[in-house]
């Protein structure tokens, strides 16, 4: 396991979910001071933070809507009062699937507001404080749908694919400040979001590895990208999908 300096603070959006919780636990085990974010359910974020603390790690819980720029700015102002946040994992995201022919504008906007606008609302205010430390790691969690496309997910694929371009551009802007910006694009991962949509037979048909990935496998990759060992990996989209492409 790659170590992370125990003075570094890490914000994980969507940290109260299955994948986000695994990322929080892995970063804490590596040494980071973890800020576990929930979009609305603070109790779930507090439960993850308590689990980390019980294991000897450092964690706190916060809740704010990443789609709401003003609420996010206010929350981040409070967090930055305690010092810069040098690790950001943009993991918050939602599904609201429908064929585009039957998709209304609200459904389109909801997904993009969380995944894409949330990326901006969270990341932008943290950049200058991070740059002043001359070290930072920004990792956004995308999806194989952004690479391959997926029926019924034009909104989700569009939002996640936009993260690829934004991250590659931001990597060029921030690399000279010691900040890396990368994207992890998982395939089918065990958890509440995938359970109903991907029954075992469908997984065997669509995933060459014939199984769903585990949240801990994605978390291990994210934690590596947040470590000193990964400093020269920058502007990359890294798939973790059991061979889907």
Predicted features along the sequence, with ranges:
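Active-site helix of classical SDR
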Residues: 123, 159, 167
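C-terminal substrate-recognition "lid" of short-chain dehydrogenase/reductases
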Residues: 120, 127, 135, 214-240
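Residue(s) in the substrate-gating loop at a strand-loop-helix junction
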Residues: 143
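Short, small/polar-rich loop/turn modules that mediate ligand/substrate recognition or access, typified
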Residues: 175, 180, 233-235
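Substrate-binding pocket helix/loop in short-chain dehydrogenase/reductase
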Residues: 99-100, 107-112, 203
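Conserved glycine-rich cofactor-binding loop
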Residues: 16-17
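The beta1-alpha1 cofactor-binding region of Rossmann-like NAD(H)/NADP(H)-dependent oxidoreductases
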Residues: 42, 63-74, 105, 216-217
